[in-house]
Structure formats: C-alpha cells, structure tokens
C-alpha cells in the first residue's frame, strides 16, 4: 500500500 498514491486519491476526493 503506497501512502503517496493513497494520499493523492484522498486529496482528489476532497477536492
């Protein structure tokens, strides 16, 4: 599980 990808995914959902 890559935190970088996960963070970007969450950020994309929040934006």
Swiss-Prot record:
GO cellular component: extracellular region; membrane; other organism cell membrane
Subcellular location: Secreted; Target cell membrane
Keywords per UniProt: Antibiotic, Antimicrobial, Cytolysis, Fungicide, G-protein coupled receptor impairing toxin, Immunity, Innate immunity, Mast cell degranulation, Membrane, Secreted, Target cell membrane, Target membrane, Toxin, Transmembrane
Keyword tRNA-binding attached: no
BP-aspect Gene Ontology terms: defense response to bacterium; defense response to fungus; innate immune response; killing of cells of another organism
Name of the molecule in the record: Eumenitin-F
Signal peptide: none
Main location: secreted
Summary of the tissues where the protein is detected: Expressed by the venom gland.
Family named by the database record: Belongs to the MCD family. Eumenitin subfamily.
Function statement: Linear cationic alpha-helical peptide with antimicrobial activities against both Gram-positive and Gram-negative strains and against the yeast C.albicans. Shows moderate mast cell degranulation and leishmanicidal activities. Has a very low hemolytic activity. Induces an ion channel-like incorporation in artificial lipid bilayers, forming pores with relativeley high conductances. Its mast cell degranulation activity may be related to the activation of G-protein coupled receptors in mast cells as well as interaction with other proteins located in cell endosomal membranes in the mast cells.
GO MF annotations in UniProt: toxin activity
